[in-house]
């Protein structure tokens, strides 16, 4: 099955891949955007732009289960942000993280009770552009307007790992499933996908791709799939151009800096 949000119909469409037929249309909130699935494919959570909410969906019964409001709706919604909104599901699938609508913060949702939970560590510094969990230690990694931060599982304290040095020509597109790598995309015709080692704050991969508007990692993080100017491209993490070439480039240069202690 293929699952797709219908922005105008306010629904999640269930599509038979073999026939291309829409076999179910499940009601969501207003103007659904991002979608995240449970690993067994029985549940889905949909971010709704205009109603500023998350819809919980049962994919076995094809039913809308609950709507979780993110903030009081003021009529403006989240439609001013380009691209799909990011979400992150914890390894045990009991916690869903979503960016707050219109504020620099992260909202934590209990997927069992469908309730928001207090999350003081979720204060970001501007729009959250990517986030994810590190399965090995439960840390949360997120990128915002100032750089990359982590929230430790043991004490729920946030700390800055890497600050942006020169990010005006890049957009943050995603974090690898293991939480070790961050993918950025450069603007312009001669574009690149840039792979950053989060811990080291260093560029480790550069891949040519122009006009990228969507990016996803494979489950093992070794492949990067991008929707670019010429269609869908599959990139191999190990098959990179020389990273030093992009670091020395007068237009692009260094991306990130390790903060001073």
Model-derived features: positions:
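Predominantly soluble domains enriched in secretory-pathway, periplasmic, or organellar proteins
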Residues: 1-261
